[in-house]
Amino acid sequence: MFLFESIPWYSWLAWFGVLAALIIGNEITRRWKWAGTAIFIVLPIVLTIFVWPTTAGPDSSTGTWFHWVKVYSALAGCLGFMAIRYIPKLQTNRWALAFPPAILAINITEACIRDFQVGAMGVREMVDGVFMVSGPWNYMNGIAGLLNLLTICGWFGIFISRDKEQDMIWPDMLWFWIIAYDLWNFAYVYNCVGDHSFYAGAALLISCTIPAFFIKRGAWLQHRAHTLALWMMFTMAVPSFVTSSKFAVNASHNDAALMTVSAIALAANVAVALYQIYVIVRGRKNPLRDELYTDLEAYKSVREANI
């Protein structure tokens, strides 16, 4: 296969199982505050003390600085978003509303640094328990990630939905930016931890995109934080699932495949950046202060569905 080695039927079953588990886990933790508290506060404390020091140690494929930073930054996002959702004073505080784009930007920056780092290694071998192939694709995708970061916009328009779930709604974060993010992030995972990308790339990204498009529109970042935290906690506790279990699916490590996914990611993010520049210039808008896409039907429908 082009992107991956052979994918047996039981790995496809596991893939759909992971996808379903992440979507269900997200639904549980977003609907009930007690569930979010248990999963994103109590469970990580237990795992940090009793599990991860053994399962995600230096000899593990999840024992790198990136995985440790990623799990805690994802959890920080979950807790920060819960604070905004459940503490009324924060919902109108401009500094508090700057937290969601800040934590998102930090997560994107972490991945860009890692892509550039892998590119600079000049390797085609096992590194930190993961087979890596360095090449121009790392730099291409790092640039795509920076463009994705720079096109984050409209955060002062974040508000809390008026239903019982009290979701964090970001109307200006529309479908085209989300797709560009997904393409970039899949390329990142494929470039830097390719043998994890069947699950940590495809299944994980789809698990937050489906809710954002079909279950609770406008809450993509909340869905992303929840599913990422759930996946990172699991994979740091059971790294063998994606590396050596019967369900593991290895990447092809094909230069053409690496180049293709990064080129698509770069093209998508260039397109979003150019469109955003057009909107800013045409509407004379300030991307650091204004919501940019208020004229679009997609924006209006998200906002109207949650107020």
Question: Which residues make up each language-model segment?
Answer:
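Membrane-interface segments at the starts/ends of alpha-helical transmembrane spans
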Residues: 58-64, 123-138, 249-261
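Hydrophobic alpha-helical transmembrane segments and adjacent interfacial helices
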Residues: 40-59, 78-86, 101-119, 175-191, ...
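Hydrophobic cores of alpha-helical transmembrane segments in multi-pass inner/ER membrane proteins
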Residues: 12-22, 70-85, 141-157, 204-209, ...
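An N-terminal, globular interaction/scaffold subdomain
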Residues: 1-89
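Alpha-helical transmembrane segments
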Residues: 13, 39, 69-72, 95-102, ...
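C-terminal transmembrane-bundle signature of multipass membrane proteins
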Residues: 18-23, 200-306
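Generic multipass alpha-helical transmembrane bundles of integral membrane proteins
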Residues: 91-218
